[in-house]
């Protein structure tokens, strides 16, 4: 007896796995219905509205035929390696649900949802006294059903068996398709993630301490003489037709005491970021940022 109880506890499906299977089933139904409605996208609007409960019931019946009826498991359960077992069977070995249980499962799930949607449409525009009483009785029955589902869910959270009220009434519960072995937990992925997170935090702390602008200026001053393009660039920079930092026509041209010209934004932002900013072309330190004299500026413009 102890060995049998130990085997049952080892093969017991986790609560989260059963709930995940239900969520996967709902996601599949939404996907199937959205894809089906796309087929009627070019038809007259509201074509499926009148027969929507019946169309949905046919689709869910089609899914039931090729999942629970033939494979003893829903799509969500198949993904999680779970299937239904007949709980009324006295045999300790696996016994699939009987044909009657599968048929009643379709009646309770598919037929119940169809009846709820269709009754709502029937009683929506009826104002007779007889229909009012029937509608009130239906509301009471739906309320009792939801109360039963709530109580069943609380029992499921305590015992981990029969995730839905339909499963409890029909005597079917979820079991693993194959016996589950003890899993070996590896920490390689976790260690790698911790190392990468630590390295990223180190870079976030270190990068603000590095003067990127000065490093780029030094690198450009070293690379320009090596490329052999310094003759034309220096001629443009010295003539005042090119910003020594961005390489474009200088906007609000300013100088820093050398022959090169800078955009006001380029030189001011660089100077505010680094008080020891030097010209990337000639290496002269910035003493003061002065606007380019109008006479020189106009002569350069007229020369174009």
UniProtKB/Swiss-Prot annotation:
Superkingdom of the source species: Eukaryota
Presence of keyword Protein transport: yes
Protein's cellular compartments: Peroxisome membrane
Pathway the protein contributes to: Protein modification; protein ubiquitination
CDD domains: RING-HC_PEX2
Stretches annotated zinc finger (RING-type): 243-283
Annotated keywords: Disulfide bond, Membrane, Metal-binding, Peroxisome, Protein transport, Transferase, Transmembrane, Transmembrane helix, Transport, Ubl conjugation pathway, Zinc, Zinc-finger
Top-level EC class as recorded in UniProt: transferase
Protein known as: Peroxisome biogenesis factor 2
